Amino acid sequence: MSDGGDAERRDRLRHDLRTPLTIVSGFAEVLATERPISDADRREYANRIHAAAIEIRELVDALLED
């Protein structure tokens, strides 16, 4: 792969990893606050964190297989 292709792949990977990490960080921060959160919102935030963690794991697995 050319240097340009490597840079594109790295940029795409950076974006693909940062997006779910931002989701995990943001929703975990909300859950860690002491402000009242409804049970429904708490479940939704936990589900989003879980989905983002699965996405990260799949990206890492794909990287390790390359």
Residue positions per predicted region:
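Short alpha-helical segment of the dimerization/phosphotransfer core of two-component systems
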Residues: 51-56
